[in-house]
Amino acid sequence: MIRFAVIGTNWITRQFVEAAHESGKYKLTAVYSRSLEQAQHFANDFSVEHLFTSLEAMAESDAIDAVYIASPNALHFAQTQLFLSHKIHVICEKPLASNVTEVDAAIACARENQVVLFEAFKTASLPNFHLLRSLPTFGSAWRNK
């Protein structure tokens, strides 16, 4: 059973937690929110025992093996790096980072700490995305006339 935490208490986090619960392989053990009241409200719905308003405290906790990051996009990279550097597996909502340099740094940090880094980017798995990939290319761009 993988013990995981969530950063963010929004609708997408709720969907992720419900899907993870259905798999029977994951247990939500910690919730982070800037507001203790928000964390408590979310935690009550899922019987979670560990609440955090400090990311550093959560990263240093022995209550989690992985974290699901669903915070505002601008925070994703810094939060990802924090947890990877504490040897905690990371599932991060898209976008993982704001540029290729940050993505490369996150990948390097995951490798260095021997943990999994996963960007939740479902669009690449959708049929219409595969159709776009199958279209002929013209130079470095696709053209539609």
Regions found by a protein language model. Give the residues of each.
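N-terminal Rossmann-like dinucleotide-binding module
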Residues: M1-F46
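Short loop/turn motifs at secondary-structure junctions
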Residues: K25-K27, S47, A63, S140-R143
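Well-formed, non-transmembrane alpha-helical positions, independent of function
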Residues: A19-E22, H41-F42, A57, L82, ...
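A contiguous active-site-proximal alpha/beta segment in oxidoreductase catalytic domains
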Residues: A97-K145
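Short active-site oxyanion
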Residues: K27-A30, D65-V67, L117
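Beta-loop-alpha module in the N-terminal Rossmann-like domain of NAD(P)-dependent dehydrogenases
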Residues: F46-C109
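Hydrophobic residues in well-ordered beta-strands that form the structural core
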Residues: T13, F52, C92, L117-E119
